Amino acid sequence: RLFACSQLGLYYDIKLIRLFVAAFASTRLIILQGISGTGKTSLAYAFGKFVNNPSIVASVQPSWRDRTELFGYFNEFTKKFNETELLRAMYEASYNENIYAVILDEMNIARVEYYFAEMLSILEMPSRDEWVVDIIPNSWPSDPKHIVNGQLKIPPNMWYIGTANNDDSTFAITDKVYDRAMPINIDTKGVPFEAPLTDSVYISYKHFEYILNAAKVQFVVSEENLKKIALLDDYVIEHFRIAFGNRIVKQLRDFVPAYVGTGGTELDGLDYVLARKVFRKFESLNLSYIRDEIDGLCAYIDELFGEENMTESKDYLRMLKKLV
């Protein structure tokens, strides 16, 4: 935050920075979404500058339909592979321990599940040994060193940051994508402030992951709150026929400790995940049908966590009620 302000003239709220950093602990795909002009792309750009490895920008086009837009394709006529900047960056990343941030700029100007579906599936594999993507159908003696049997291992030091505008020119992002990503809403412009001159830092991805994993040990989500989350899950299943799911619970266990490690509170971290990962699913329901149930849900949240807490979730639910 101080680096972005002092070096780049970019202003971000401290909570937004906490959410952004914590998201790296929970998923490989971060979605920065909101209205145009709020600094979504600039935030991802500033992160690359801060860690001394400029972000790679892949400008998504409306014509993107499949994986070849990301990786390129083998031209059978010329017998040459037409590579993309992203593929070059992936190959380069396999040779060092820098942190790589790939910006999928305006990611929903095309259907995300068309061109990124394979990556979503691969990055969910529990073992990083399974993080491999097919590049060419056959292997050749002249293949680059890290292309083995036509496959390239997806580098563990790379994260993907999509920016998404919510307007009529874009496609809605599906639940399949949202479930596997961490969405962060940026709906307001940053307020200027004074900051001391702050330099960039070099941090290897291994040290970055060590810090994130250390937070999971030091700031593990309390059993009391996990029990409350389980009770809330049962309530939502009974009244709304929607379940949290194991994936979201795992992300919650990964995200919240990192959020606390950046200076946030456990309840605020839980509140954010519930609002953006669980209650967001209500938008796909018949809002007129669930309208009367929302007040009961808000009351149950107050009963579990206290009236003064979970404000983002309750505000989001009340906003949905007003849409009816």
List each language-model region with its residue ranges.
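Alpha-helical lid/collar subdomain of P-loop NTPases
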Residues: 156, 196-324
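AAA+ P-loop NTPase catalytic core and its hallmark functional loops
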Residues: 1-211
